[in-house]
Amino acid sequence: MEMKNIDFILESDEALKPSERLVLLLLEKHRMLYTNDLLALSNLSYKTLTDALTALVLKSYVLKETGKGRRQNCYRLV
């Protein structure tokens, strides 16, 4: 699986909405984030966040390592 790099994210300015660029930059830095973490870091609404994530990232429904058995959406770069 190829990772998008930060140069690609910054150069593809016209192709991406600001919210999409922000999400990609956050994932480039952190490699993997859960929904609540992305919401907190990006300050985007849930709808804007999920719209930005739709085609750009790999989503999986996983057990959070620090959680008490609750499953959460986890996002990584595709």
PLM region spans:
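A short, conserved structural fragment
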Residues: V57-G67
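Pre-recognition alpha-helix immediately N-terminal to the DNA-recognition helix
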Residues: R21-L26
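Long, low-complexity, charged/polar intrinsically disordered regions in eukaryotic proteins
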Residues: M1-E11
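Short helix-capping/hinge SLiMs at alpha-helix to coil transitions
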Residues: E14, L27-H30
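Short amphipathic alpha-helical interaction segments
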Residues: L44-V57
